[in-house]
From Swiss-Prot:
A GO biological-process term: intracellular iron ion homeostasis
Name under which the protein is recorded: Iron-sulfur cluster assembly protein CyaY
UniProt keyword terms in alphabetical order: Iron, Metal-binding
This protein's encoding gene: cyaY
SUPFAM superfamilies: Frataxin/Nqo15-like
Gene3D superfamilies tied to this protein: Frataxin/CyaY
A Pfam family matched in the record: Frataxin_Cyay
Family named by the database record: Belongs to the frataxin family.
Entry-linked InterPro entries: CyaY, Frataxin/CyaY, Frataxin/CyaY_sf, Frataxin_CS
Length: 107
């Protein structure tokens, strides 16, 4: 993926995720924002979820209470996929967010 295309696609993905997360009542009171391409969410227990784009690797990186994960874009599946497990970014976030807020989250 070309650098400009990656940057734009990654930024749009982060903005879309923030918008979708904001729609859930269970997440509404949590501190969430995007600053300089880094999406940060802090759970009530102090745990954090951080998503940011890594230009050099053309990936979105996730740091969460589960540990780190790296996601590359698969155009054929139109999804960001974990480079080790193949799990989608959305499925990973559903699990991490559900565990963090104690309610089922489906982005």
């Amino acid at each position: 993926m070309a650098d400009i295309s990656f940057s734009l696609h990654a930024e749009q993905t982060l903005e879309s995720l923030l918008e979708r997360m904001s729609e859930f009542d269970a997440l509404a009171d949590l501190d969430m924002d995007i600053i300089d391409g880094v999406l940060t969410l802090e759970f009530d227990d102090g745990g954090k979820l951080i998503l940011n784009r890594q230009e050099a690797a053309s990936q979105i990186w996730l740091a969460s209470p589960e540990g780190p994960a790296h996601f590359g874009y698969d155009a054929d599946r139109d999804a960001w996929l974990n480079d080790r497990t193949g799990e989608s970014l959305t499925d990973t976030l559903n699990r991490v967010l559900s565990a963090g807020c104690g309610e089922t989250i489906r982005l």
